[in-house]
Amino acid sequence: MSHHPKKVRIGLIQTTCGASPQDNLAKAVEWIRRAAAQGAQIICLQELFTSQYFCQIEDHRYFALAEAIPGPSTEVLGAVAAELEVVIVASLFERRSAGLYHNTAAVLDADGRYLGKYRKMHIPDDPLFYEKFYFTPGDLGFRAWQTKYAKIGVCICWDQWYPEAARLTALHGAQILFYPTAIGWHPAEKAQYGERQHAAWETIQRGHAIANGCYVAVPNRVGHEAPDGGPGLQFWGQSFIADPSGQILQKASPEQEQILVQELDLDALDVQRTHWPFFRDRRIDAYAGLEQRFLEDRNV
């Protein structure tokens, strides 16, 4: 029986972001067109691409940036998706209701249809990453969507530190796991901790690719942002794509705007999972403890 190899070309967009949401959306559309012109069929934008990273401070003014999903931005992007016949993953600030907001990724299929959304499950509260002030933790669980070109899953930035998130998304059948991201260096920490911070970030996501036998694709923003003065953040770019063995297929610049376009062989997932059968050997009867916050000594 003949078999036609299943391949797909994905695109990651790494750019700077300015103060105007309208300009940022227009820029995203322009770069989506560039990625599509290079052959990308599934295109992922970076986290919260319609604004600068406002979570560096806690300020109620920034709630005005939020919008409904589906809503104005997904309408624009859906039309572009249909025109170019590309799948788009778009990370947006979602206004769900009065006083209820999420950090959310919308998935638009190649015919422009809105397939659904993922709400960021893990919300950080670190210096210059004060997301708990703005975002309610997600309540939709981990998901995957069958698009025209591949079955994809989406997690967002801080989710990337949690193996459970990648695992559950892969168990929903995701062949490619996208992580739209906004991560960078605190200026006071870069000299001492910068190299190890970046290495840890890259390493753990390569590990997700290995453990789950899937592709991992991570678009990060780039450039220095200090929307309210102060030291700001230096976003380290270096968006990357890893294969199911954890090898980096492409990596972007730490300083420049860039598009990564990479062909992925989806048939390689079956080969990888057959030779490294981690799904086969999982002890699903032994993991109940993962539902606990911490496992106390039973003798106490």
What are these regions (language model features)?
Residues 1-42, 178:
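N-terminal active-site segment of His-dependent metallophosphoesterases
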Residues 7-19, 104, 117-120, 144, ...:
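Active-site-proximal beta-strand elements of phosphoester/diester hydrolases
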Residues 10, 107-115, 240-250:
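Short, glycine-anchored, charge-dense loop/turn motifs used at functional sites
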Residues 21, 30-117, 183-207, 211-212:
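Cys-nucleophile CN-hydrolase/nitrilase-fold catalytic domain and related Cys-dependent amidase chemistry
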Residues 66-89, 151, 157-259:
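CN hydrolase (nitrilase-like) catalytic-core segments centered on the catalytic cysteine
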Residues 90-92, 104-107, 143, 239-241, ...:
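Short beta-strand scaffold segments in enzyme catalytic cores
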Residues 120-134, 256-273:
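A short, polar/charged loop-to-alpha-helix boundary motif
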Residues 142-175, 181, 269-300:
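Cysteine/selenocysteine-centered motifs that mediate thiol-based redox chemistry or coordinate metal-sulfur cofactors
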